Each structure stands twice: as structure tokens, then as C-alpha cells.
Swiss-Prot record:
It holds the Pfam family EPSP_synthase. The gene is aroA. It is found in: Cytoplasm. Catalyzes the transfer of the enolpyruvyl moiety of phosphoenolpyruvate (PEP) to the 5-hydroxyl of shikimate-3-phosphate (S3P) to produce enolpyruvyl shikimate-3-phosphate and inorganic phosphate. The active site is at D332 (proton acceptor). Belongs to the EPSP synthase family. Monomer. This is 3-phosphoshikimate 1-carboxyvinyltransferase.
């Protein structure tokens, strides 16, 4: 029978989770809508003419930040209290100059993609900010190419940190060779290119997630993708038209349950309606390399995105090396893969993941230090982690650092630990997975 494996406790600084586990995961579940697609559906719907309907939108804090900002810019967006949302677009080029500061909350996607949109709307002044974490995250990676297009952006530390002020301009198209494979950088420039006259091309060193490319095409943008050169070209000015969007389940959220089922003896679960876009399935490939007993069923395409149901059972995992071109395809799953590696036979090495140091927290430091408290043999490297498998974890007092993925990854590690684990600042899970606790209670049996 399902049991209360996790207790939610109010705390002076937020919410604390207390996990006392003895059991296994069993059953079927669905997961919240994909966060990346949810953001883009709201933004493109706001910029399009006509109505956009969104089914399966993630009702997390980050998409709420996006909706809040675009309402202030003139779009009509229904309340995010159900997964069915309507957006009445204001039309590309017709954003209003807001009389408030646009607050992106904790959402790097909201802020970075929105910069490309705001910078390309001439004769308007915008001010954007975020929470303490977001205001410490690097924005220079998107501001630099926007300035090459003619954008006027000012901010702290030589125009690299929020709060930021933007004076919209008529931008010029560019060819930008991005030094990093980042869907946020690519998408920011793509949004800016919608209003520039001519072809804007972005080339990456490796493929990053391609939700923007798929959705730009669906909304009517003139876009050319060349996978051989990892480049995408947007021709502006564009005309966008409202669409009916169906958001699949977020594979980054599914990853927590995939790893939990793989490492907890006796577990056997199905996760239904998971987005399996090939630019996001690095986590599946790595788990298969590690020996996970996993199959994909009912594979289909829904609103232009590959979707499948995933069946996974407990199995003995083996250590591996995670590096190179696969990193952009699983960058958000590195924390939970580190947990999987703890229970594998042999060592696991994670390299080329320095990007994790500038996420909602320094995720390499956060995972290393907190898992060490639980008895893990894990060593932090400049761009990754060295993890010795065969762990025997003990419950401990750990901190999420206010990072949703760190907090949920620690919760999964606690399922295989002896004794009680207390996770502080666990309320951060609501950023991407508001019903994480409910799903765990549903799947857990003892």
C-alpha cells in the first residue's frame, strides 16, 4: 500500500522535507508539462496574432513568472490554475511599454529569452529583474550577441547581471558562433531575429534542445535548421499566428522517478506521456549505458514533439563516463544522474559540465557537499564530479540551496539511505514540479 515516506514540515526559512524510507516504488504516474515548452508556448502565443491554446502547461513557478511578465507587456493570458491556458496575442512588434518592472522570479529561461524579445521592440523602455539567485546568474552570454545586433542594454557588472534596463531598437541580423551549446542563448537570438530584417544565424559547438526551432516553425516563422553544422537561421521580419499547443510531460521531471526506480530494490513503474525529443534524451542513453532495465512503449508524435511511455524496473547499474556532446542533452539531469552513480558498481566520471556552476545554485558544489554529508564518496572537479559507486548512505541534514533540482535529487538519494534525511528549503521544488511530493506518495509502497 502507498505510505507517507515524506513528511512536509513548515520552517522559518521555507519548507523542510523529512524522508524516512523503507519500501519501493510501484505503479503508473504522469508528470508535469515540459518546462521548456511551456515557457516558449506562452511567449510565442503572446507574440502571435490571434489566440493560442495550451494544453498540459506546467503550473510551476517559472511559467507563472513568464505569464506575469507577458501580461504586463499587453498579452491576455488566462489564469494558470488549470493545465488548459488561453493566450490572446498582441502581435509581434506590438508589445506595450510596461509601467512596472518585469520580474522573472527564479527563471533564467524567462529572463534570457525575454531579453531577445524586448531588445527588438523599438522606442520602448523596459526594466527587468529577478530574485536574488537570478540576479547573480550570468546574462552576458545573451547580452553580448544582442549588442552585436544593435541592442541597448544596461546592467550591473559591465552589463552582465540583472537588474537590467533595455531600450528597444531596430536590430540588425547577425551570424553568431556561440561559444557554448545553450538553448537559452540560441533561443534569445532567435527571438531577436524575428524582428530583424534579414537572416540571423546561430551556430553551436554541439546540438542543444530544439524546442524553439520546432515551435517557431509551428507558429509560422521562416526558419532553417542545419543539424550537420548545428546551426539555425531565422528570417525576419516574421508573422506569427496563434496555435493549439499540447505540452508533453517533462523528461527532466521523469528523470527523478527513472533513477529512483533503477536504484531502489523491488521497484517497477510506468511513467506515461513523457516527451522524448532526441535533443533531451541524453539521460535515457546514459541510464541504458549504466544497465538500467528500461523500455519505451507507445511511441508517437504529439503536436510536433516525440512522446512515449517509459517502463523501468530496479536493476544493478554500472559506472560510466558522462562527457562531451551528450552534456547539453542532459545538463539538467546531471544532479540526479550523480545519485544514480552512487549506487552503481564502479566509478562514474562526469566532465564538461562547468555550466552547472551558474544554474540556480552551483550544482556541482551543492551535490558534492550534500551527498558527502550522507556518506557518499564523491569528489568535485572544476567541470564535473568523480563518483565512487557502491554507496551505503545514511540519513543526514542537507540543504537544497534553494535549487529545485538539487532538492529533488537529494530526496531520491534519501530513498536509499538508512535512517531519516531532512532536506531544507525544499519549497524550491515548486519551480518545476509542484506535485513532486504527491507523486512520491502515490508511487511509494512499503
Amino acid at each position: 500500500m502507498p505510505t507517507d515516506v515524506l513528511t512536509v514540515c513548515p520552517a522559518p526559512t521555507g519548507t523542510t522535507w523529512v524522508i524516512q524510507s523503507e519500501g519501493y516504488l510501484q505503479g503508473k504516474t504522469t508528470i508535469p508539462g515540459d518546462k521548456s515548452i511551456s515557457h516558449r508556448a506562452l511567449m510565442l502565443g503572446a507574440l502571435a496574432s490571434g489566440e493560442t491554446t495550451i494544453q498540459g502547461l506546467l503550473l510551476g513557478e517559472d511559467p507563472r513568472s513568464t505569464a506575469h511578465c507577458f501580461r504586463a507587456l499587453g498579452a491576455e493570458i488566462s489564469e494558470l490554475n488549470t493545465e488548459h491556458v488561453r493566450v490572446q496575442g498582441i502581435g509581434l512588434g506590438h508589445l506595450l511599454e510596461p509601467d512596472v518592472v518585469l520580474d522573472a522570479g527564479n527563471s533564467g529561461t524567462t529572463l534570457r529569452l525575454m531579453l531577445g524579445i524586448l531588445a527588438s521592440h523599438p522606442d520602448r523602455l523596459f526594466t527587468v529583474t529577478g530574485d536574488t539567485s537570478l540576479c547573480s546568474r550570468p546574462m552576458g552570454r545573451v547580452i553580448k550577441p544582442l549588442q552585436q545586433m544593435g541592442a541597448h542594454i544596461w546592467g550591473r557588472q559591465s552589463d552582465t547581471l540583472a537588474p537590467l534596463a533595455i531600450r528597444g531598437q531596430q536590430l540588425q541580423p547577425i551570424h553568431y558562433p556561440s561559444p557554448i551549446a545553450s538553448a537559452q542563448v540560441k533561443s534569445c537570438i532567435m527571438f531577436a531575429g524575428l524582428m530583424a530584417e534579414g537572416q540571423t544565424t546561430i551556430t553551436e559547438p554541439a546540438l542543444s534542445r530544439d524546442h524553439s526551432e520546432r515551435m517557431f516553425a509551428a507558429f509560422g516563422a521562416n526558419i532553417i535548421v542545419d543539424p550537420d553544422t548545428c546551426s539555425v537561421t531565422v528570417t525576419g521580419p516574421a508573422q506569427l499566428h496563434g496555435q493549439a499547443i499540447i505540452v508533453p510531460g517533462d523528461i527532466s521531471s521523469a528523470a527523478f522517478w527513472l533513477v529512483a526506480a533503477a536504484i531502489v530494490p523491488g521497484s517497477d513503474i510506468w511513467i506515461e506521456n513523457v516527451g522524448v525529443n532526441p535533443t533531451r534524451t541524453g539521460v535515457l542513453e546514459v541510464l541504458e549505458q549504466m544497465g538500467a532495465k528500461m523500455t519505451l512503449a507507445n511511441q508517437r508524435t504529439v503536436a510536433g514533439e516525440p512522446v512515449a511511455d517509459i517502463h523501468i524496473q530496479h536493476s544493478q547499474l554500472h559506472g560510466t563516463v558522462i562527457e562531451g556532446a551528450v552534456i547539453p542533452r542532459l545538463v539538467d539531469e546531471v544532479p540526479i544522474l550523480a545519485v544514480a552513480a552512487l549506487f552503481a558498481q564502479g566509478p562514474t566520471t562526469i566532465r564538461d559540465a562547468a555550466e552547472l556552476r551558474v544554474k540556480e545554485s552551483d550544482r556541482l558544489t551543492a551535490m558534492a557537499t550534500q551527498l558527502q554529508k550522507m556518506g557518499a564518496n564523491i569528489t568535485e572537479q572544476p567541470d564535473g564530479l568523480e563518483i565512487q559507486g557502491g554507496a551505503s548512505l545514511q540519513g543526514a541534514d542537507v540543504d537544497s540551496f534553494g535549487d529545485h533540482r538539487v532538492g529533488m535529487s537529494l530526496a531520491i538519494a534519501a530513498l536509499n539511505a538508512t535512517g531519516s534525511t531532512t532536506i531544507h528549503r525544499a519549497e524550491a521544488a515548486a519551480i518545476s514540479y509542484p506535485n513532486f511530493v504527491a507523486t512520491l506518495q502515490q508511487l511509494w509502497h512499503s
